[in-house]
A protein has these predicted regions:
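Short beta-strand segments
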Residues: 23-58, 64-66, 72-76, 84-86
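Alpha-helix boundary recognition
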Residues: 20-21, 67-68, 106
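A generic local structural motif
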Residues: 12-15, 39-41, 59, 110
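Charged, gly/pro-rich active-site loop segments
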Residues: 1-8, 81-153
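Short, conserved active-site entrance elements at the starts or edges of catalytic domains
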Residues: 2-34
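A short local loop/turn or secondary-structure capping micro-motif enriched for an aromatic residue
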Residues: 48-49, 61-64, 92-93, 140-142
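Generic structural signal for secondary-structure transition and capping sites
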Residues: 24-25, 71, 110, 130
């Protein structure tokens, strides 16, 4: 099978931003502090143009790991059109999340953690590194963001 021609960096960034704006779910990977076991879970998210907002039970492995380490790695899209995002994380209680943000999250994802008896936390993820590629011919130049700054115009 011959892959399609490699996209330009500008097209990859455009496709990545489209996916962030329109996709609903992302794979969230975490690990416990001090080399703890890795953990992977799909969660719904909202992109506000600068950060991703997710929610998970405070006492879940993902919630505990995010609080303890303040870091995550996300996988967005299918394996042959993947976006990998490494980010720093800020925990936000439902009480501290602006009402408008909670409403946007519930509206886009169809899920409102504020309505549940289980204690949830929201997490804002600030991307630090973004990579995107489809096939082997896009491995070179896959890095779109480094140190929190887009390197692709």
């Amino acid at each position: 099978m011959t892959p399609p021609p490699a996209r330009t960096a500008e097209q990859r960034k455009k496709d990545t931003l489209h996916r962030l704006e329109h996709d609903v779910d992302v794979w969230v990977s975490t690990a416990g502090p001090d080399g703890g076991a890795p953990y992977l879970v799909p969660l719904s998210f909202v992109w506000d143009g600068a950060t991703l907002l997710i929610a998970t039970p405070a006492e879940s492995p993902t919630g505990r790991n995010l609080v303890a380490t303040g870091r995550t790695r996300l996988g967005l899209g299918p394996t042959r059109d993947v976006v990998l995002i490494e980010g720093t994380v800020q925990a936000v209680t439902p009480e501290d999340l602006p009402e408008e943000d909670a409403e946007v999250f519930a509206g886009k994802t169809g899920f409102d953690p504020r309505q549940l008896s289980t204690r949830y936390l929201y997490f804002r993820i600030l991307p630090q590194r973004v990579q995107a590629w489809r096939e082997e011919n896009e491995l070179r130049g896959r890095e779109l963001m480094r140190d929190g700054t887009w390197i692709t115009p």
